[in-house]
A protein has these predicted regions:
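Basic/aromatic-rich interaction segments and small domains that mediate binding to polyanionic partners
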Residues: 2-69
Length: 69
């Protein structure tokens, strides 16, 4: 699924570790806004989180963990 910049999305962050922060199993429905598609393998998106998690406000999330809000 292709998401556009400024699109509101829901994220399943359970089990992901980003910049030393591990998201617990309960973080399956975080809200965010797509900033841009990121080049990576697997493909993903740079997302601005609605709420900061342990100081993280922007994170890269694999495409399979993103869905429309």
């Amino acid at each position: 699924m292709l998401f556009q910049p400024n699109q509101r999305v829901r994220l399943n962050l359970a089990g992901l570790t980003v910049n030393g922060v591990t998201f617990h199993a309960a973080v399956t429905d975080a809200l965010g806004t797509i900033i841009k598609e990121s080049s990576g393998n697997p493909p993903g998106y740079l997302v601005e989180l609605l709420f900061s998690f342990k100081g993280l406000k922007e994170i890269e999330v694999p495409e399979d963990r993103v869905r429309p809000a």
